[in-house]
UniProtKB/Swiss-Prot annotation:
Disulfide bonds: none annotated. Its cofactor is Mn(2+). GO terms for molecular function: metal ion binding; superoxide dismutase activity. Belongs to the iron/manganese superoxide dismutase family. Destroys superoxide anion radicals which are normally produced within the cells and which are toxic to biological systems. This is Superoxide dismutase [Mn]. Mn(2+) binds at residues 27, 82, 165, 169. Gene3D superfamilies: Fe,Mn superoxide dismutase (SOD) domain, Iron/manganese superoxide dismutase, C-terminal domain. The lineage of its organism: Bacteria, Pseudomonadati, Pseudomonadota, Betaproteobacteria, Burkholderiales. It holds the Pfam family Sod_Fe_N. Binds 1 Mn(2+) ion per subunit. InterPro entries: Mn/Fe_SOD (IPR001189), Mn/Fe_SOD_BS (IPR019833), Mn/Fe_SOD_C (IPR019832), Mn/Fe_SOD_N (IPR019831), Mn/Fe_SOD_N_sf (IPR036324), SOD_C_sf (IPR036314). Homodimer.
Length: 211
């Protein structure tokens, strides 16, 4: 079965005034759909199916036919990255995390303010197109990072739990070249409950439920 564009759990205008409806619609139905189409075409051209989750596919790119490595990296990464992005934003988002995620951000990253400063710098410091990330390393540690283009932390063995798209298509209609304003707007829609859920899943997969 080919990969499909995931439906959003909210309307395109639900994140306004922080992220406008037109940007959301174009970003979802055109940009993300293009990545889905490109990934399906690459796999079909190589005679491969798409039965596994795209996240699993990205972890094993070296095992795929060399001729499709670039397409899977770009289109598969774009599909996985955007699929995460839609879920970690919410009309009722914003604020700060609580519970275990908040405690571990405090212990490992110096607290929420320090995390947000590092995440902002990752987003601002990414030259050109790319992403800012909060990930879980194979050692079960939180890490702030960035990646170029549509590269996913999954390709390096890390598990993303929060991601921000800093390609211009993600913000230019509303914010033009004002990337700092876009980053600040993103914090107002982050769904920390979803990020925390992803954190618990990542730790569980590493066998660190009680760590």
């Amino acid at each position: 079965m080919p990969y499909v564009l995931p439906a959003l759990s909210y309307a395109y205008d639900a994140l306004e005034p922080h992220i406008d409806a037109r940007t959301m619609e174009i970003h979802h139905t055109r940009h993300h759909q293009t990545y889905v189409n490109g990934l399906n075409a690459a796999l079909e051209g190589a005679g491969l199916d798409s039965e596994e989750p795209v996240e699993q596919l990205l972890r094993r790119i070296p095992a795929l036919p060399p001729g499709i490595h670039g397409a899977v990296r770009n289109h598969g990464g774009g599909h996985a990255n955007h699929s995460l992005l839609w879920t970690v934003m919410s009309p009722s988002g914003g604020g700060r995390p609580d519970g275990r995620l908040a405690a571990d951000i405090q212990a490992q990253l110096g607290g929420h303010d320090a995390f947000q400063a590092a995440f902002t710098q990752a987003a601002l410091g990414r030259f050109g197109s790319g992403w800012a990330w909060l990930t879980v390393t194979p050692a079960g540690r939180l890490r702030v990072d960035s990646s170029a283009n549509q590269d996913s932390p999954l390709m390096e063995g890390n598990t993303p739990i929060l991601g921000l798209d800093v390609w211009e298509h993600a913000y230019y209609l509303q914010y033009q070249n004002r990337r700092p304003e876009y980053i600040e707007a993103f914090y107002r829609v982050v769904d920390w409950a979803e990020v925390a859920r992803r954190y618990e899943i990542a730790l569980a997969e590493l066998g660190r439920e009680a760590a």
